[in-house]
Amino acid sequence: MSHLTVSKILEDPFSALSLSEMLKILAALGWSTNYLAMAHRTHADRLPAIAVLPLCCDIAWEFTYAWIYPQASGHWQGVVRVWFFLHTAVLAATLRYAPNDWAGTPLGKSRARLVLLYVAVIGAFAAGQLCLALEMGGALGFHWGGALCQFLSSSGAVGQLLTRGHTRGASLVIWGARAISTAGGFVKLCIRFQHQVDGAPWLDSPMCWFYIGIVLSLDASYPVLYQLTRRHEEASGRGNSGKVKNR
């Protein structure tokens, strides 16, 4: 029962475990949409749609559990590899337009410095993900490493809105895909935990529930902050059409 298939869903579509499998498919499609939307928004606005830390942490986590500990990702194994390749596209777009985001800083004066920065941060997160897997085991490392990725994705998106003061590089499509995937993933984990199947070896941890609460709170706050920022843009006459020039 740990590896439900589409045929199994069709046989008993109203069971709790079938629902968890449907939510897994929803999360897989949702996160993929999120990454594609980030790449599109980055090219459209010529400004990175994701901050340094969440992007580098995501790539490091996906590399670790797609290629080094693939067995630890369980029923997510193939999906994690797809996400890794999608994130490389996001990284390529980000590196192309990163100088526009770092203008006025020492790093922003050299694309080579920015490339080295991203490589160094990815390497640091990869080392951390490996250490976490060695410390806690692959299964728990996969989930807690992914928890860090989700926290950084949600907090990084909110942070970009607050610090940039405009909505270029931001998108409600990116937020919606992330929020739906995250919420659906949490419900899926709860179902699998209650039925004692793989994919949820950590929900008895108070820290896990704190993490779930803070991520959901950040995702809930994003559209409010986005609309407030849009109103500020409209009031100041900037709007979202004022793209920066590619350097």
Swiss-Prot record:
Keywords per UniProt: Lyase, Membrane, Transmembrane, Transmembrane helix
Enzyme Commission number(s) from the entry: 4.2.3.-
One annotated GO molecular function: lyase activity
Gene Ontology CC: one annotated term: membrane
GO annotation (BP), single: terpenoid biosynthetic process
Pfam family of the protein (one): Pyr4-TMTC
InterPro entries referenced in this protein's UniProt entry, alphabetically: PaxB-like
Class of the enzyme per the UniProt entry, highest EC level: lyase
Protein name: Terpene cyclase ausL
Organism: Aspergillus calidoustus
Underlying gene: ausL
